């Protein structure tokens, strides 16, 4: 089984990114042939600063490696180093319906009332995402719940292509974790934790110092009750339960049983301590990896060479199926 996923190099990685995506990347190395990339081409669909983007690519790559990605057990690269992604995106756009793209939730959220002013790249973002995955004939796509619609679109694109041009592309499946898929903002638990749309005190970053993490959890919004349990009117406590369950690798029911006699203050401290212990080794490894930028660049370049060997074969198959370019023997 082949696994593919990517992560944007925008902003610092927060606890939601880590639990919802990065831990799945690491686990994927044991489930099959894992291919991961830092998707810098997606990052340029909104306003950005070039120098900051390059730094963010390195920061993101270092975080992923610190979390446990092993270039000896997976293919890990920078998206823009593999031009097959962009050519395949253009070819797939010919079988992607305008209406499908117009219904994408993330496009509506990011474009807001200024839809006529946003880039065409933001609108066609899901097609590039489809190309990212389909280029590698991936079966399994680990994503957060908010990306489910994008995986459904890439499935539709692959099925439409195969129906029109013959069986060429593998139709992927989304893999969404049962616990922690959506870690919410500590100050506004009705919305997910976010680097751009979240609150400063409500977002816990992977590289936060221990004191900052503890402070954020101590001030986390809860409710006027006292029971450590999930419920429709207990979004804040429910979020903390899910966070603790995720970092411990247990079910939320186990957390509820363990802390049923605890008060909110003690429970918040327990969650904070668990998160500090969970992230401390990652922060230390990140700092060491990030200090060797030349070594980090070599790792990404080596991964890109391996990725191109696969993506170029897929692109050739797609071109041949569509009648684009000279006739060549198909694999």
Which functions belong to the PLM regions below?
Residues 61, 68, 96-99, 138, ...:
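A generic secondary-structure signal for well-formed alpha-helical elements
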Residues 2-131, 274, 287:
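N-terminal Rossmann-like or analogous alpha/beta NTP/dinucleotide-binding catalytic cores
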Residues 56, 84, 149-150, 236:
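An acidic site on a long C-lobe helix of protein kinase domains
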Residues 112-161, 165, 185:
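Internal, conserved structured core segments that host functional sites
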């Amino acid at each position: 089984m082949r696994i593919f996923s990517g992560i944007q190099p925008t902003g610092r990685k927060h606890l939601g990114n880590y639990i919802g995506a990065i831990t799945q990347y690491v686990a994927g190395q044991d489930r099959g042939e894992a291919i991961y990339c830092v998707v810098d081409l997606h990052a340029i669909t909104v306003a950005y600063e070039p120098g900051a983007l390059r730094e963010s690519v390195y920061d993101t790559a270092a975080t992923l490696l610190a979390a446990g990605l092993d270039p000896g057990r997976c293919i890990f690269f920078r998206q823009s180093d593999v031009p097959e992604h962009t050519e395949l995106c253009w070819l797939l756009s010919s079988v992607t319906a305008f209406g499908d793209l117009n219904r994408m939730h993330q496009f509506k959220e990011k474009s807001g009332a200024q839809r006529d002013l946003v880039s065409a790249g933001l609108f066609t973002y899901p097609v590039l995402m489809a190309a990212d995955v389909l280029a590698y004939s991936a079966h399994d796509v680990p994503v957060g719940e908010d990306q489910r619609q994008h995986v459904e679109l890439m499935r539709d694109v692959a099925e439409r292509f195969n129906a029109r041009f013959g069986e060429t592309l593998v139709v992927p499946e989304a893999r969404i974790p049962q616990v922690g898929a959506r870690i919410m903002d500590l100050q506004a638990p009705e919305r997910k934790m976010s680097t751009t749309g979240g609150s400063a005190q409500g977002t816990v970053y992977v590289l936060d110092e221990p004191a900052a993490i503890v402070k954020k959890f101590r001030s986390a919004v809860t409710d006027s009750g006292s029971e450590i349990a999930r419920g429709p009117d207990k979004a804040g406590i429910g979020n903390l339960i899910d966070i603790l369950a995720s970092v411990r690798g247990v079910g939320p029911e186990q957390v509820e049983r363990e802390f049923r006699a605890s008060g909110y203050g003690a429970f918040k401290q327990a969650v904070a301590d668990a998160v500090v212990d969970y992230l401390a080794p990652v922060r230390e490894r990140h700092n060491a990896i990030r200090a060797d930028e030349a070594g980090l660049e070599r790792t990404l370049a080596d991964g890109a060479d391996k990725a191109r060997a696969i993506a170029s074969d897929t692109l050739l198959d797609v071109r041949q199926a569509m009648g684009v370019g000279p006739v060549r023997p198909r694999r």
